Structure formats: structure tokens, C-alpha cells
Amino acid sequence: MARIAGIDLPRDKRIVIGLTYIYGIGNTTAQKILAEAGVSEDVRVRDLSADQEDAIRATVDKLNLQLEGDLRRKVSLDIKSLQEIASYRGIRHRKGLPVRGQNTKNNARTRKGPAKAIAGKKK
């Protein structure tokens, strides 16, 4: 099992898909990493040689990407910063409402949670 950036990649997936299991690496970044490391995108994770694994690890380190815990911490601190300065986005985060301008009159149930009953209102 290939272990890159502290994450065990799924053995049966293609390496380009397996890399996206690392928080902070999407499709485009995975393709760039593999191109720079000189590894084919079609290789399965289980079929990687030790040299290929090392090349991928070295490329990930060389690109200075923020991954996993560091990136999660940065996003969390950015949201806290928005809340502290009481920007519009920070207030929306604090209230648990959509942040990017979506309408909330009818939908937004994912962000707002289950509908709350209103006392005295009958159908």
C-alpha cells in the first residue's frame, strides 16, 4: 500500500485518482505531480514500483503544497479571522447560513439544518 503525505492510497484505483484522496490534492494537481514525477496516470497504486513512489513523494515535497492537517488548520483559521473582523462572510459563517450569496427563502436546508416548527402555525 502506497503511503504519501501520511495517507494510505487505495490499492485498486489508478494513481491519478488515488492521489486525490489526499486533502489538498485535486485532479489537476494530481496530474501535474505525475507529469513532473514521470509516472503514467494509468498505473494502479498496487503496481507502483518503489522508485515511482519515491518520485511522487519527492515531487509532492518539492511543490510545497499545503496538505491535510496544515491546510485544514489554515482554512479553519481563515474562517475564524472572518468571524473576528465581523465581515459579511464571517457573520454568515457564524449564523450557519450560506456564505456565497445563495438564496435562503426556500432552500438552503443543508446549511440551515432541519426546519424548525413555528408555534401557533397550522396548515
From Swiss-Prot:
The keyword Lipid biosynthesis does not apply. Transmembrane segments: none annotated. Keywords: Ribonucleoprotein, Ribosomal protein, RNA-binding, rRNA-binding, tRNA-binding. This is Small ribosomal subunit protein uS13. Located at the top of the head of the 30S subunit, it contacts several helices of the 16S rRNA. In the 70S ribosome it contacts the 23S rRNA (bridge B1a) and protein L5 of the 50S subunit (bridge B1b), connecting the 2 subunits; these bridges are implicated in subunit movement. Contacts the tRNAs in the A and P-sites. NCBIfam families: uS13_bact. Belongs to the universal ribosomal protein uS13 family. Part of the 30S ribosomal subunit. Forms a loose heterodimer with protein S19. Forms two bridges to the 50S subunit in the 70S ribosome. Residues 108-123 have a biased composition (Basic residues). Signal peptide: none annotated. The lineage of its organism: Bacteria, Bacillati, Bacillota, Bacilli, Lactobacillales. The gene is rpsM.
